[in-house]
């Protein structure tokens, strides 16, 4: 069992250490009103890959097992996973470009489709499928890790992404932000 905790610990450590670097590079990119380089984008995916590995291992082995009915956990978890994947995919499809979806094309602000109800549906989709994975595994540690990621993503959007989008798109973004909530909102 020590190998499991070591693997989860290393994954969390790599996520944190790479996150410090990645978010500082994102800040530098946003300060220049630039776009994500392929290197930065790859590091972003590696960083979150290690995070996902920690959540998946924690869930797969039921670390810090929560006494929830197994049928409820499986059913509810799979529903959350499917909903999360659909929301994530819908957000990506609305961009109509992988480059735009990954921050490499900033030619226009996307406010249509699922973006009428959330300014960050891709993050919401990830949150749902991660919650589903944690629920299926009934892992308390996975839920703690998800809570940490929610804090990180909220800080990222409020401190880095939103000021950048406001500088980039100006009044168009301010109007959009006044109509649509950061996470989930009813259309205003």
What feature does the model see in each segment?
Residues 104-126:
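Active-site-proximal inter-transmembrane loops
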Residues 1-109, 129-164, 168-188:
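Membrane-anchoring alpha-helices and their flanking helix-loop junctions
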């Amino acid at each position: 069992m020590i190998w499991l905790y070591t693997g989860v610990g290393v994954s969390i450590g790599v996520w944190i250490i790479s996150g410090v670097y990645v978010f500082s590079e994102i800040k530098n990119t946003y300060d220049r009103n630039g776009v994500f380089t392929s290197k930065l984008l790859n590091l972003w995916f590696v960083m979150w890959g290690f995070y996902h590995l920690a959540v998946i291992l924690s869930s797969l082995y039921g670390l810090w097992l929560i006494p929830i009915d197994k049928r409820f956990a499986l059913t509810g978890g799979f529903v959350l996973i499917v909903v999360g994947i659909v929301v994530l995919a819908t957000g990506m499809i609305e961009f109509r470009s992988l480059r735009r979806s990954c921050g490499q094309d900033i030619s226009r602000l996307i406010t249509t489709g699922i973006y009428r109800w959330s300014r960050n549906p891709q993050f919401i989709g990830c949150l749902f499928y991660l919650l589903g994975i944690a629920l299926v595994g009934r892992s308390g540690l996975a839920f703690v890790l998800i809570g940490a990621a929610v804090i990180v993503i909220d800080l990222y959007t409020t401190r880095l992404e939103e000021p950048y989008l406001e500088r980039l798109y100006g009044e168009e973004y301010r109007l959009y932000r006044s109509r649509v909530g950061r996470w989930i909102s009813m259309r205003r």
